[in-house]
Amino acid sequence: MQFGRTYEEFEVGAVYKHWPGKTVTEYDDHLFCLLTMNHHPLHLDAHYAAEATDFGKNVVVGNYIYSLLLGMSVPDVSGQAIANLEVESL
């Protein structure tokens, strides 16, 4: 069984779907905020977020989402890759 793709196996414009998916919960976001000492009320205070955003509720920390996406890509890139040199767009 091969884990990951080599550089030559990636194609420009290809879409790679990663399993398993992840449903982000309020608990996940709050835990990430606490672990990273991000205490901005936009992420933790529902009353503040309801008044300060167009969403009407807390906003998930962008770094958390990026970390999840990067983690989901590990099976495709980490097994054969020597280094991850660049992430151009997500």
What are these regions (language model features)?
Residues M1-S89:
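Hot-dog-fold acyl-thioester-processing enzymes
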